[in-house]
Regions:
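Left-handed beta-helix
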Residues: 24-32, 47-254
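Conserved core of the sugar-phosphate nucleotidyltransferase
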Residues: 1-42, 56
Length: 254
């Protein structure tokens, strides 16, 4: 009842470990919630933390520091009933972001009593010409020309060409705007510009920052491949990932 932690297991794997950690009653508002999960946020008295770091030879908080603290000190949990997700895998990261662009997102950025502020960038507002956006989140500084965006997240400085289509995808954007001279130089090397090329179709994918997707590219994973490594891309948990600074030439199909 006091919220004191008397046992802790980092990433329990077996039924026996889970059974040992089940609480006799729900700690929050959900009657079916019978476990406490660590969010990885810890508050220490400075002197206590110093003593632990000196006395424990290992340095992993979850595996070593916290278990030692529980053995010898009073450790208490602050129960949090709000939105929290572990996004340590490609699939979890993808699902969490795509859910934000749904009609009923799990987390709301725009609550008047608790708005979320991002880092100030002083970028111009996004410009969209002849676009159709349905359930989309579009960050600042983008230029989107006659594109169709459905349940997708579009990051800062994204350049999306004419007639491109995004479905259930995450486009991380870019760290910079490409100058005309740089675009010409890359074109001479048959390298597409930063952004999503005209006529490209992207479905259930994550496009990392500064990626170059050429004209008429199709990223769809129609075969439903779960795990694969390709040239300029990889697939994890069925999600196609274009890595940072990746290049997908025009006409390529994934």
């Amino acid at each position: 009842d006091e919220g004191r932690i008397v046992a802790f297991c980092e990433k329990p794997q077996t039924d026996e470990e889970l059974d040992a950690l089940e609480l006799p009653s729900a700690p929050g508002d959900d009657p079916d919630a019978r476990y406490l999960a660590s969010m990885g946020i810890y508050i220490f008295e400075p002197s206590v933390l110093t003593s632990l770091l000196v006395s424990v030879p290992e340095d992993d908080f979850g595996k070593h520091i916290i278990p030692r603290a529980i053995e010898s000190l009073n450790v208490f949990a602050h129960t949090f009933d709000g939105y929290w997700e572990d996004i340590g895998t490609i699939g979890a990261f993808y699902r969490s972001n795509i859910t934000l662009a749904s009609t009923q997102p799990s987390f709301e950025f725009h609550k008047p009593e608790a708005p979320i502020f991002t880092r100030q960038r002083n970028l111009a507002a996004t410009r969209m010409l002849g676009c159709r956006v349905d359930r989309g989140i579009v960050a600042e500084g983008c230029v989107i020309d006659d594109a169709q965006i459905e349940q997708s997240v579009v990051g800062v400085r994204s350049i999306i060409g004419a007639s491109a289509r995004l479905y259930q995808s995450i486009v991380m954007g870019a760290d910079y705007y490409e100058s005309p001279a740089d675009r010409e130089r890359h074109a001479a090397l048959h390298v597409p510009p930063v952004g999503i090329g005209p006529g490209s179709v992207i479905h259930r994918a994550i496009v990392d920052k500064n990626a170059r997707i050429g004209t008429d590219v199709v990223i769809r994973n129609e075969a439903g491949v779960m795990e694969a490594d390709g040239e300029g891309y990889y697939i994890r948990e069925g999600i196609v990932v274009i890595p940072k600074d990746g290049v997908i030439p025009g006409g390529m199909r994934i």
